[in-house]
Amino acid sequence: MDPPAADVDAPFTTGAPFTESAIDLTGDGIPETILREDETLRVLQGDVEIWRSDPAWRVVDAALGDPNDDGRYEILAALWKPDEGGALGSHPFIIGHRGGTVKVIWGGSAVTYGIHEIALADVDVDSVEELLVLESAQPSDGLDAAQRTLSVWDWHGWGFNLRWRSEPGRYRDLGSTEDGIIVATVGK
């Protein structure tokens, strides 16, 4: 059941899209720096860039964790990329370190609802991270806020299964507190 819609001022959240953080992708005990700048995702080891997203992608958000429950840290990227006809589609991609290099290890098909914001959290306290997605119509169509939904997904071996989706217009922001607690802001 969804909570009643209400305007909530939540200044303690950081609901802006991902910009920078660090996580140990390579498993060597030294975290790599992950940057999102101008819709481009970059991975740095020290000052050396070891991976950059495809120039055709528009990376709108990212989350760091273990989205596919394989015991290794990865980057979950929310991105728009052109299909063969040039139309942009919204996709979730997992980027990880495999075989000595950082690369896309899973690329999801275009989704029906455009991905606006993402987070990884263990919402059901089973020691496995779920994917939280604030979805919307493509921002350029002007209907974004009224169509936002919050959905929860879990990994099933080679993709995500939808576990729950709110009614449209109930949620407006995903963020986190300074302690890393995920907060979904209610309201239009």
Segments predicted by a language model, with ranges:
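Beta-propeller-forming repeat regions
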Residues: 1-188
